[in-house]
Amino acid sequence: KRNFYGVGNGRDVTPYHQTIEDNIVAELVGELERRCAYAERRAAIRDFNRESRVIRKGIALTPVKFGISFTLTSYNQAGALVHVYTDGSVHLNHGGTEMGQGLHTKVAQVVAEEFQIDLDRVKITATTTGKVPNTSATAASSGTDLNGQAALLAARTIKERLGDFAAEHWSVPRDQVVFLPNRVRVGNQEIPFRALVWQAYMGRVSLSSTGFYKTPKIHWDRAAGRGRPFYYFAYGAACSEVAIDTLTGEYKVERVDILHDVGRSLNPAIDLGQIEGGFVQGMGWLTTEELWWDEAGRLRTHAPSTYKIPACGDRPRVFNVDLLEGARNREDAIHRSKAVGEPPLMLAISVLHAISDAVASVADYQRCPRLDAPATPERVLEAVDRLRA
């Protein structure tokens, strides 16, 4: 906690001279400590380790602060193409690639929310540069931020055209045209959304638009290592508890508690899934996924039989994941949400430190063990043996 960013007095400036304006890490960590009973469990684990000769437990709580944006500033742009058809359905194409992370669902939600129509009325087709050219990589956890904003701007352009047409067609003030779920209030009457679209088509109103978005405020001098490379930061914290076998080096992740900041979540189910998946992927990175070459320089861990990615059985026995309540991105990201792709990966550092904490108990916590990542059972056993030597 002594190393947390503070407020003012130079405690809120990064090494690359970006001021931290949305620092909530201390608040978030404090809330997780309370929820997972960190202090009480640490004391209980100390008591357990004094009585147990073979099995030792460890616990660790680690935070993460993850900057969101490409550090190559030119990548922070996106386009989208939206068509509204005369039956009231919407066709959407954007520059992001769906790879199972829920990007298409979130961007479709953004468009459906703007038009106030059901999600199943929005169809997304596969990303193609024939529709949206010069796409940026779907990376840096920025897919929803960039493509969601571009789609929102395209939809908003069409919505404004529809509103202007309705006001003129039914002779009412513009502020009396209100979009409601699947319908539009025009003065004292309500008409289905699809009926308004049909009337607009008959009135020769364009029902197609592109949208373009570029992330504001960011700049980065790579040579000098100075600037504001990130639009905002995503925060999270994880508390992990493990048990190790000091005779074999094998271990099990017994419990994980995560509290993560996603701002105003666009889709909590997707965000929770991303956090869980990112954490387990990070566990693999730090514990089992070892690259090993033989004396001839040949990679031997090149298949699922030797390169050990986490399986279902490696999942924590107890896995509690919560989104930070009341969080709201202070920057104008899409609907004040925050990115959630890569940040949770770093929360798995808590597993590595929990294993290290369990190993340290062998020497009654008097020495800090050397434990290299990935912390395979062999390396855990070596760390235990070094402390016993």
Where are these regions (language model features)?
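Conserved beta-alpha junction segments in alpha/beta enzyme cores
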Residues: 60-89, 94-101, 232
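C-terminal catalytic domains of large/alpha subunits in multi-subunit enzymes
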Residues: 1-64, 68, 109-389
